[in-house]
């Protein structure tokens, strides 16, 4: 019988790694508060800082903030549309070399930063391109941060081995059980190959990994793939764009019941350290549909 283990950031946190987005944000809060040309600030630092200042819960949820800006939520339109419309109303017929007082706008620092990068003739296309390019830079900064945390950790691998073995080989391994396991890893770290061996366990780092230098942030693709602005920011699009290992062969993560094959179905699904948040809705829907878990 096959088992699927799904691990989220709670696994790395349990192993003592400062891998949460909150920990990362603490390192970059200054860049959002007071950016200057030539530093390593990105527009996402400013967006998240503004969200934090307004006490919105999305400040520690980059995926939720991405969705807010490029897709919207419920009846709320995408923030990018509102932002561009307000900007056009603000500049009116002023000449292109005019000086603007950004403090009169709802997002003064965001407008100021955007104009410093792409000029003041802002439209949805140029703004979306800026958001996408800066998201890639933001991901690189996160990779650098997380790599440093791994290097500073004295016992991450030891803790990962302890918890990983407990999860893979717990008391659920009863009669009819086999060692056939798959791991859906939502983390950017990947201790599993070192712990289990390449042949023993099928591991998918669905959002990329530090080792492959393809870490991604993105919003859930559910309902968003038909939106031209939002599509490039969806996880499904970014996974394909970045060539994340195993992304096109998700069928092997979970096995449907086959009456002609004994003990091949996915009989156990274990979830550890994952919030089941909306940003990963599509993954779980696909898995649960495959095993008919309803």
Model-derived segments and their meaning:
Residues 1-18, 24, 256-294:
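SIR2/sirtuin-family catalytic core signature
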Residues 251-255:
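Extracellular beta-strand/beta-solenoid scaffold signature
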Residues 36-249:
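Extended, H/D-rich, highly charged conserved domains that either
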Residues 15, 21, 25-28, 210, ...:
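Solvent-exposed, flexible loop/coil residues
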Residues 21-45:
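Short catalytic helix/loop segments, enriched in acidic residues and glycine
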Residues 28, 196-199, 291:
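Active-site catalytic pocket residues across diverse enzymes, especially alpha/beta-hydrolases
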